[in-house]
Amino acid sequence: MNLPLLPTTLVGSYPQPDWLVDKKVLLGRGPPRVRMREVWRVPESELQSAQDDAVRLAVDDMVRAGIDIPTDGEMRRESYFNQFATALDGLDVDAPGEVLSRLGNKTYVPRVVGPIRRTRPVLVRDVEFLRAQTDRPIKVTVPGAFTMTKLAKDEFYGDVGRLIDAYADAVNAELKDLKRVGADVVQLDEPYLQANPDEAREHGVRAIDRALDGIEGPTALHLCFGYAYVVKDKPEGYSFLPELEASSVDQVSIEAAEPDLDLAVLAGLPSKTVIVGALDLSSHEVETAEIVAGRIRAALAHVPPERVIVAPDCGMKYLPRDVAFGKLCALVEGARLVRTEIGGDA
């Protein structure tokens, strides 16, 4: 990929248009783990075409803002999780089970009732469509095996390690197809590594490496505390982060704008590119470019610029679109300021 120093990207999601989703439904619940079809305002017969239009708008916003590595904004998803996680064989999503979320709330999740298998591509058309919208490098996200295991009720395997391995194999098959059709960067979303650090230390690196086995080109992993809309009070540090140095993933995406994070922890990832969260998504206030630049400079005290990518803290799904666009413009300009300061091309 031909990218400038301190390139910019999104973690994944961007606000969906009001004509596509019912924001009262979307904002009235947490991210769904099973299907939430009632969120869509468009009839099923017209939904794919409407989602295509939403992707066009999202990519146009990202390109106009100057984002170097756009996504499709996850316009087709009810959550980062459920589009892929409910498309696998071996699951009952119509009679879901219950587990406790990382916030301690009961949440409905797929029941594992047979062998987990990916029998068909899930996101291939999404990537093909995104690839046709821009000549810039593109990124696509898939929920990781560890997180999918924590958001499922196992009634088949009886062993968490075997369940993780089955999910990882399904993710691996999907990622290979996504790379084949043009995804430049593939990202695993693994928020539950942070939420379950003891179990993550036992299974996390294996889950990542198995999912990424044989994947060529840049790979990323997003590790977060949860959407700012859902999680109001974020901890001051990651319970699982330096452990990722032992994994095969190339890029590690962290929150660094909203939480009061000591960025010295980044020194524990000497072989990784760090996707530094530089936009606070808990506020609708649009940062100035200088505020963003200050957050980037703080990261550069611990990571060389050649190993830094700049992004929002997390997905932007729950923001108003005008706010999200303004924040992306500030992100790009803030990266440009720092790039100029350190002698990179503006």
Predicted regions located by residue number:
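Domain-level signal for soluble alpha/beta catalytic cores
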Residues: 1-346
